[in-house]
Amino acid sequence: MLDKLSQTEHLDRDELYNCIESMFDMSSKVRVYRHLTDYSGNYDEVYNEYAVLNLKEVEQKLADYYLDHVLLEETKDIEHLYYVPKVVTTYLKCEALKALVYNHLGQKVYATDKCGQSDFVIFDDSAVLLLDFTPEGALKGGFLSTLPDDVKYVSDVYDEYRQGAVDYLKRVPCETSTKNGLNRKINQLKSSLNLK
């Protein structure tokens, strides 16, 4: 996505966090898109990692930062989208993410099998931040653009994936994401893999 933007300013991690904090305070509407990738290459490990709410020390928490703060700011209009990379494993991973976000953060989750390539945040349709991660998933920094054309492009991409998520969820059977339901899925998964 970065190569589609006309003009960006590179920010290191500290600059990115400072920028986010100041922009968030000034914003009435923030849209967060999170491109969730299995950085380890191991689907089962990632599923269990999210299911038991153990995020380890991976600095992939920028969207969570917003969600945590948004819960304290009921006037904020937040929309967010989680990407699920492989269709064949989408159902279980979607359920784990639903439990993580809905039960613990009070937010609904959308999941889509489309790939946006980037995590990004849009502030009031006037600025966009793209997040820059290492291959292991650590947050390095980001790119900021306030050009109207850039913001519109990213907003259009966001809307495209949001619609994709809505269409996708219509095809996925829904199940209440309770702790018991999630534990049952984990046990089923472990049994199928002969894990203890």
Where are the regions that the model predicts?
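HKD (HxKxxxxD) catalytic microenvironment of the phospholipase D
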Residues: 113-148
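PLD-like (HKD) phosphodiesterase/transphosphatidyltransferase domain
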Residues: 1-86
